A protein has these predicted regions:
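C-terminal catalytic ATP-binding subdomain
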Residues: 1-14, 125, 130-134
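Hydrophobic/aromatic residues positioned on beta-strands within the core alpha/beta folds
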Residues: 101-103
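Charged docking surfaces used in two-component/phosphorelay signaling
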Residues: 35-43
């Protein structure tokens, strides 16, 4: 499960971020995880495009290389995993921030591919920190 329901959304925290001019590519193969992450991103007014696997993410970036301010990338996905997708995206757009989302506590981020990582379940404050760091 992606969300931490123990801590309700703090309206003051999300009101500090306004990403209405930013487009984020959310890459996640689990529908519930996708919905929860999209909920958090909508709370800060981000424009969200979705991809359900790494191959779809690569195609979206190929179509419009400068469209996205950030990519949030699941690691374990069908067709093409997150690491492979990030490698392909780096060839198209070397400077786009890519943040790994992983439920694996032992995921070791390859810093030449990913800029950062966030563990699942996603914590809203940690996600907002990532958003502030890379796109705000």
């Amino acid at each position: 499960m992606l969300i931490n329901w123990i801590h309700p959304i703090d309206k003051q925290d999300t009101s500090k971020l306004d990403l209405k001019d930013k487009r984020i590519l959310l890459v996640e193969d689990n529908e519930i995880n996708m919905e929860v992450a999209e909920f958090y991103l909508n709370a800060v007014h981000a424009n969200v495009d979705k991809a359900w696997n790494g191959l779809e993410a690569v195609e979206k970036v190929k179509e419009q290389p400068n469209k996205y301010s950030l990519i949030l990338m699941d690691i374990m996905m069908p067709k093409m995993n997150g690491d492979e997708a990030a490698k392909c995206i780096r060839k198209i757009h070397p400077s786009i921030p890519i943040v790994a989302m992983s439920a694996q506590s032992e995921y070791s981020m390859n810093q030449t591919i990913m800029n950062d990582s966030i563990s699942k379940p996603i914590d809203e404050q940690k996600l907002n920190h990532i958003l502030s760091k890379y796109v705000a």
